[in-house]
């Protein structure tokens, strides 16, 4: 009987990293307290590796103790001190997931925000081979910023994280992913002060894609749509005038592309009927692109077709 009880107690003490029910805490755990004291003693001797091992033992073997979130938080801090930010961020995340009632919960989220934003700006680095500090891997940065959003989706930090992510990806030429980040901000946080700029960034990225050689009709059309959305949502914003000018430029570009299509049908495909249809479309848009409309009318005259 005593053996069975002892075995049950041992099972209670020896837990894996499997998370306990969120908010579960054991009132007093003397073994956890002793391990915390041992960890602090190692810290006092500047044995950070040894201290981390003791703190890890607390969270692995005594996950229900009051000391578990303290150990988790301190372990994360020590990883930061050792220039191991990925390990630190992971420990903060586990604290957030497993100890939402801990007084350290908000501090952990705050540290994650600082780390994620610092990694995106390049201020936070990762130490390699014990001596070289290098920028964080883009995969880490992207995941971290999404964690910041997801951990507090209704806080102001969520749209901030998406804005930082969009800027980070755009600076690296990852246009599609950057647009997705900005779109997430605009769709889910329309009242954020960052939303107008994010909407304008979407339009700008599509326009840049068109200007950089990818004159795909879809990119130009999406840029036009993004500018229209911006002006519809924020007609009185400080940048509305510039957005209207950019929108007009996109409309002119679309008409110019229609003219190119008409020329292609006429000169390459030898399809006069299709060419005439396109020329008539362009000719009707003189208020948007006068030069293209004039060219289309001249072509229609050559083809002896009356413009609409």
Tell me the role of every PLM-derived stretch:
Residues 1-10:
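Bacterial N-terminal signal peptides
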Residues 11-308:
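Acidic, polar-rich low-complexity tracts and alpha-helical solenoid repeat scaffolds
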